[in-house]
Amino acid sequence: MGSLVRLLKELYVPGKDICISPRGVYTILMNIMIGCKKETRDKIKDLLGIFGNYVPIPDKSEYYVEYYDDKDELINKSIMLIEEGYPIKRDFINSSYDIFNAKVVSFTDDTISETINKWVELSTRGLIKDFSISLADDIRLAIINVLYFKSKWKYPFDTELTSKHPFKKYNGTDVMIDTMMIQDVAFYYKHDEDIRSQVVMLEYEDYRFVMFIIIPDSVTGIDGVVDSLNNGKNINKIISKKDMTLKEIVLYLPKFELEDDVDLKDALIHMGCNDLFKSGELVGISDTKTLRIGNIRQKSVIKVDEYGTEAASVTESCTTDGIKKIPIVKANVPFMFLVADVQTKIPLFLGIFQG
């Protein structure tokens, strides 16, 4: 599911909600990578889980998506802001458009922020309305990626069964929150002894997308789940469908909406991409030696209710004795969620709900 899940470990603060889009970060880094020196490009490859001399031939369909039907909506697109008159290489502009469909917009002052804010709001169907971008005097180039996802559950929750239930927060206090309930449905389910958590897979109407809920056995068990996110292999093992059993359960899941705005610079530096933010590394973007990346920022919003999931990000997821016993699974402690795109194997959204 991708090495970028490690970002969650870098950004994790006990007791604090978090939501990021690995797919959005992946798109931005792949775009930047085509303009980097070999050494910096190799470090980005390591971060993205691309090993050896192999570099995947980018497929435009992976990075520029406007996918609609009566079940799902997925939008992934980019825009590139270039200071008017600044010498950006034409090859980089062309490649960014050909692969990522990144539209190029010239700017002369900070008035461009209103235009970008409207573009983000329209692209995310109004889910993100206040994406402010401040183009300081030393900003020459900005690449903005938008990812929007909306999908209906294969098995929707009955709104009549939603009610207030206690949720135990990380600090041990209880809060009453709106909690959905579904029964008489079989979900892929397992108890993972390594991370001491229950794992449930919820399917959307379009089988391309799924959501995994990882519910620790204890209130602070989320720490152990986060600690396990050392690389993509670990998360792949945790959410491996082949290790799960299709089982009828009674599931209690909070309705929730999270909004997060994070600067990814320190996390990416700690993960080995420090050269990315140094001058002189972006030789494929401009001959100017002083050009560097100031920061990589992402704003994400996710909404989960009885009908399905709506999410967006902007970047600058037995029987015994003949009597059937149905497990009751309650997501009533801090838990992790992951929205996965089965087709690309890259998580769309990943986060932790803390109540």
Curated annotation (Swiss-Prot):
Listed Gene3D superfamilies: Alpha-1-antitrypsin, domain 1, Antithrombin, subunit I, domain 2
Keyword S-adenosyl-L-methionine listed: no
Classification via InterPro entries: Serpin_dom, Serpin_fam, Serpin_sf, Serpin_sf_1, Serpin_sf_2
Keyword Cytoplasm: no
Disulfide bonds: none
GO molecular function: serine-type endopeptidase inhibitor activity
UniProt entry keywords in alphabetical sequence: Protease inhibitor, Serine protease inhibitor
Membrane-spanning parts: none
Gene Ontology cellular-component terms listed: extracellular space
Entry superkingdom: Viruses
Family, per entry: Belongs to the serpin family. Poxviruses subfamily.
Protein name: Uncharacterized serpin-like protein FPV010
Source organism (scientific name): Fowlpox virus (strain NVSL) (FPV)
